[in-house]
Amino acid sequence: MHELGRLFLHGGADPPDQRLGDVLVMNLQTKADFTALMHKFLDPLKPCYSAGCARLHLGETGVTYNQNAIELEAFSRPLWALVPFWVGGGSDPQFEEIYRKGLAAGADPENPEYWGTTGEYDQCYVEMAAIACGILTAPEKLWTPLSDTEKQNLAAWLGQINAHTIPDCNWQFFRILVNLALKSVGMPYSPELLEDGLCKIDSYYSGDGWSTDGASVQKDYYIPWAIQYYGLLYSKFAADTDPRRAALYRQRAQLFAQQFVYWFDANGAALPFGRSLTYRFAQNSFWAACIWAGLEPLPLSLIHI
């Protein structure tokens, strides 16, 4: 067995579960349950980070982008769980030190673990979003501990997203989030590209709360994660600076929820459909974003499914 698999199977506290026939079903009811599940998934990664903590090499399976982006992706994606954990009052000193060191090393052009100079349509821009959201919501973990030089390096590395072309689709939110993050910590950002990205996102709106993912007309579980989810995050991050759009995105989320609820069964199970097959954990992200943004489009007892 691969060592990572061994650690996953035997490490960390177990969330509660129950059996439904031959199927093991997790019974997640409390914050502690979800915290235990997060640790179950992420704790096995701790010994796998690179020496400088900026990279994770988790296997040899292939993707369409290069090894640099693969290892950055593995570094950044755990932040989608760790940042809410920190914002909710959680603490894990080991992960906090890993990400402090990793951000410093990965953004340092003189460091062998530097994430590099980006180009057109670069996968690195996708991974910037998690870092940006971390800076926006948990700066005391991901920004404040950095030295002045490390902050300048990280801002410069993130700022590359403003110097290159990105796809005309949900990727616009990555540039939006990066610019919001840079602005929030007093670093150079592009108000012009921030507004341009928001205008593009607005152009995707198709009515009744729905948006398309750019020019694509398909509708699947990816859309709520790629558009509505980030829209709700924006509505909270920019509530004071862009109240008109913040209110608009919340209104659209209210409309969207009335239809999207029927994409889940009474137990919360979702259909194995579309691009969503590789993003199963993101299928319910819209509902989590609603709660975090203080929005209750449906009774909480129903959302809790």
What do these predicted regions represent?
Residues Q18-L20:
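A detector of repeated loop/turn-to-beta-strand junctions in beta-rich toroidal repeat architectures
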Residues E3, L7-D14:
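Glycine-centered tight turns/hairpins at beta-strand boundaries that repeat
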Residues E71-L72, L82-P84, E96-F256, V261-I291:
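Aromatic-lined, polymer-binding surfaces characteristic
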Residues V25-E73, E97-G102:
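Low-complexity, Ser/Thr/Pro/Gly-enriched N-terminal "stalk/linker" regions
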